[in-house]
Amino acid sequence: MTMKQVTTKTTRRWALLRAAMLTLLFASCHLGVTAQEVMDIISKNPAYASCNYNLYPDSVTFQMTAPPKGKRPFYISHYGRHGSRYISNRKGYDIPYLMMLHADSLDELTPMGERVLEEMKLIMTDSENRWGELTSSGLEQHRRIARNMVERFPEVLGGKTTVTARSTIVTRCMMSMAAAMMELMQINPELQISMEASKSTMRYMNHQDKELKKSQMTPEAKKAYNKYTAKRGGNKRLMELLFLNPDIVDEVVDEQQFNYYLMKMGLFQLHTHLNKNTYLTDIFTTEELYRMWQIDNALWYIQHGACKLNGGRQPYSQRYLLRQIIADADSCIRLEKPGTQLRFGHETVLLPLVCLLGINGYDLETDNLDDLEKEGWWCSSVFPMGSNVQFIFYRSDWRDKDVLVKVLLNEKEATLPIRTNCAPYYRWSDFKRYYLKKLNLYDKRK
């Protein structure tokens, strides 16, 4: 072996070692988070317990890994959830509210129970005819995310460039899109912005696969879920706190449903202008909120994760969206200055998309619901109100064919299950090959 061959071989080994170390570093970031107790997070941020009603952080710490030498961002592709909103319909509030009214009619409320009922009346009045509407907090979340995008990637959003925005035909998504676009325009008036909300794009913007949905709660999944939740539902302490004779009101108050939906009512309030009034949330202990999180987290995994209890296919509900993202990117990267493509939708799209991509290990496959917490499958971290996945593309100039892509989950660098020697950057050719193969295999098995 010549000296040149030895040097080349050594260089290659160092490159592979560096890639392995970087991949391990980014994986450990995720594992480090999962090592924390969820209860500790909930004690600081009770909204975390509500899973898909979690609050988007007021500030995000930017810790950006420098791209390989000469590479610069040139295109952004994105899918984001609408911002904070009111509860979609009054049913979730009516369940605990009507139970409390019935107990009150029987004179069975304690002084604490009477105070809680007054708080519930206040929330019901504030929410009436606002079901599902975006709140002022929701608008601000998208303005802030847009500002951050410009601040971090001025190469993409500076000067006279194009921003194409699409949303589902749901009002809160359209308003989220409008808030973000207005903020971008205010920062850079030269932007060429177009917005669209059309039924023609709903096939990939908000695809709800009926066949997959039918197979979510298989007998095996239902048995496992019921066993998992049996030891976590209910709240005798709460019943004794609010009702004079819990045994009597047991006939009109379903303990498990009451506990669950009263918690939701209090936590949802954190998204509205009543967010300074945390009385309903404060009546629950951190452990009680934690148990509710466990119940919800397991259900979201069954419904949208790669859960072995129902075949592990649920993330493929977003196969059309992923194909569209790939096709759009392939088209855009041919341009000298492709700009930005933003999409605004829902958490029932974003969560399975994250699982389909395997971002930060969310492609976890298990039939043991007790594994979720220790493995770091925490849905609250994926889809708070305003959550987003950003694909940032890099190259040296428009002639550069070696395009790289980096993924941000809620504005933080994330990992993918793809080999790379420059994590968290991945070759676009590898990205395409990996995911198109995955999607094609699924289509063949259908």
Predicted feature locations:
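Signature for phosphate-centric chemistry
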Residues: 36-162, 168-341, 345-446
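Bacterial Sec-dependent N-terminal signal peptides
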Residues: 1-38
